[in-house]
């Protein structure tokens, strides 16, 4: 369930320059469960006569617009959900959130349910009418249609993506049982059209309309990590679940955009899945491998397996749009190997948003917290606590932002707009085989500034969108969770800007200018850790937020609350 919350625009932060955007919270998740302790059956409510209110729905994950209605699907307790193979340890409980894992009531009632999914709850579906400013929950349209439809929704690990095209709204997400679950609505009447499971795929994140055709990017294999496909939607309101494969890629697709008559996609690496089974990076110290202390060798690198930018054939050549014969004709135009000097850390790079702006393609990286650390520990097990701490420190990365023109051509030019000229790299042969970290060149000089727009906790360049002639980049800021909600006191005489809690939204006002901060505090809620999705309506952005703080439900005015938020960013 959700509450409709209509608030005035957030106060503009004190600044000499008033930003050209205004921000308004349109709707907010409401408490949907009562919590009385880890491993305790959930009391009735809310309202909660026993225990405290809990808000499970944490992300606006898939977001689309059909006419004057926004459609979106949510994700519940996303911070607590772990991929297949992940090692779950003890439950987590603090003032902000709880992850019960195998001690949750659903897991205890079903011992066969994996602990990694103990905090799973079914996603919800909503529409928001832009004319009447009315929020309507549509979840029951699915669950009341048939037991099969209800079962598909109940086994969907969040409605991670959404699209609206030719009178059909599609919401899709990975199934906890395998495959991708897709739900369809009539975009004009709102009528529920049905659901299906696409068993050949395991993950789906984004869709794009290019040349009048709707495409989706998917992953294949465990957690989507074995390969990637681009699907062309060939359906309609009568048969909404027909697709054809138009790209066959070595890694799963993250995001898609049209640029100069082609599709470009960003991908995640295979290592993100492999690394999920690595030992815990905070507790692993190994003895020296082998009698002579010979370091372990990293796997041979295949750049096709790294996070990359791939380019399609021209959309206008041959039969309009992309077709099955185009599936093997995509070109890799960039990979993480062109920037990250450490060969193990680069295997954990993922890519996020990308967009066409000013005749150039922009894209950014994503860094799952401690993913590179876990991967590095699995390849080069540390031999002391000091070496473990060095690995933790030197494998952390904030996102970088790049842009390129004439990609794949003889006059190709790629610039690092925000990033580093050097990054730590591990030399396993140093210190007689013990290994050591040292600065290594990335081969670039950033045009405008450091990684994460200068914030080391800005880990994801999660989504990009062009609205009103500006390129917007939404981030995921991990500071609140990493610092456990306690901002450290900067040392005396410090010249660096302290981190802020809450996601950021930045804008490039023109291709020749540095990015400008629109907001760096989660749009007034420091618990909003990420700008998960954005869609464009003219010069207006509609933004879906990620906020996993499921125990932050104090209704006192001015107290930040957990759960998803739907936000409008518009020109003044």
Provide a role label for each language-model segment.
Residues 22-52, 126, 132-154, 196-198, ...:
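Surface-exposed loop and turn segments in beta-propeller and other repeat-based domains
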Residues 59-61, 145-163, 199-211, 248-257, ...:
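Repeated scaffold domains used in trafficking and secretory/extracellular systems
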Residues 76-78, 168, 175-176, 219-222, ...:
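Residue-level signature of beta-propeller blades and closely related beta-rich strand-turn architectures
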Residues 465, 472, 530-572:
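Blade-level signature of beta-propeller repeat domains, shared across WD40, Kelch, NHL, RCC1
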């Amino acid at each position: 369930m959700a509450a409709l919350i209509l608030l005035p625009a957030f106060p503009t932060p004190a600044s000499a320059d008033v930003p050209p955007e205004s921000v308004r919270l349109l709707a907010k998740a409401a408490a949907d469960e009562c919590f009385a302790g880890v491993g305790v059956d959930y009391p009735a409510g809310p309202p909660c006569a026993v225990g405290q209110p809990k808000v499970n729905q944490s992300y606006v994950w898939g977001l689309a617009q059909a006419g004057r209605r926004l459609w979106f699907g949510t994700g519940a307790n996303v911070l607590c959900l772990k991929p297949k193979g992940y090692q779950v340890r003890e439950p987590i409980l603090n003032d902000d959130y709880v992850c019960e894992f195998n001690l949750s009531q659903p897991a205890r009632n079903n011992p066969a349910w994996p602990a990694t999914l103990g905090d799973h709850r079914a996603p919800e579906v909503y529409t928001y009418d832009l004319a009447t400013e009315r929020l309507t929950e549509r979840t029951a349209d699915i669950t009341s249609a048939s037991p099969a439809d209800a079962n598909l929704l109940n086994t969907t690990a969040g409605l991670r993506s959404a699209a609206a095209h030719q009178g059909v709204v599609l919401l899709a997400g990975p199934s906890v049982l395998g495959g991708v679950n897709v739900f369809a609505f009539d975009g004009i009447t709102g009528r529920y059209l049905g659901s299906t499971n696409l068993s050949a795929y395991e993950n789906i994140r984004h869709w794009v309309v290019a040349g009048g055709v709707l495409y989706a990017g998917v992953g294949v294999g465990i957690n989507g990590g074995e390969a990637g496909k681009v699907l062309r939607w060939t359906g309609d309101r009568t048969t909404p679940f027909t697709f054809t494969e138009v790209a066959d890629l070595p890694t799963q697709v993250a995001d898609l955009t049209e640029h100069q008559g082609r599709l470009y996609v960003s991908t995640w690496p295979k290592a993100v899945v492999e690394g999920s089974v690595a030992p815990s990076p905070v507790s692993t110290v190994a003895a020296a491998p082998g009698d002579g202390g010979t370091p372990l060798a990293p796997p041979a690198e295949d750049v096709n397996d790294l996070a990359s930018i791939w380019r399609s054939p021209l959309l206008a050549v041959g039969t309009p749009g992309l077709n099955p014969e185009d599936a093997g004709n995509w070109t890799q135009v960039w990979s993480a190997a062109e920037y990250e000097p450490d060969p193990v850390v680069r295997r954990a790079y993922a890519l996020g948003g990308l967009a066409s702006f000013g005749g150039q393609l922009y894209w950014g990286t994503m860094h799952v917290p401690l993913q590179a650390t876990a991967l590095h520990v699995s390849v080069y097990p540390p031999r002391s606590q000091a070496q473990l701490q060095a690995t933790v420190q030197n494998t952390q990365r904030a996102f970088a932002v790049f842009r390129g023109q004439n990609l794949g051509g003889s006059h190709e030019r790629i610039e690092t707009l925000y990033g580093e000229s050097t990054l730590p790299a591990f030399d396993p042969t140093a210190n007689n085989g013990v290994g050591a970290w040292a600065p290594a060149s990335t081969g670039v000089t950033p045009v405008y500034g450091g990684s994460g727009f200068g914030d080391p906790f800005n880990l994801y360049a999660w989504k990009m969108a062009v609205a009103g002639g500006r390129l917007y980049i939404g981030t995921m800021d991990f500071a609140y969770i990493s610092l456990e909600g306690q901002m450290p006191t900067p040392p005396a005489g410090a010249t660096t800007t302290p981190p802020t809690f809450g996601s950021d939204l930045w804008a490039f006002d023109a291709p020749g200018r540095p990015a400008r901060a629109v907001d760096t505090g989660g749009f007034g809620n420091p618990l909003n850790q990420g700008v998960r999705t954005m869609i464009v309506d003219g010069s207006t952005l509609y933004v879906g937020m990620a906020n996993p703080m499921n125990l932050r439900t104090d209704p006192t005015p001015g107290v930040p609350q957990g759960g998803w938020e739907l936000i409008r960013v518009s020109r003044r």
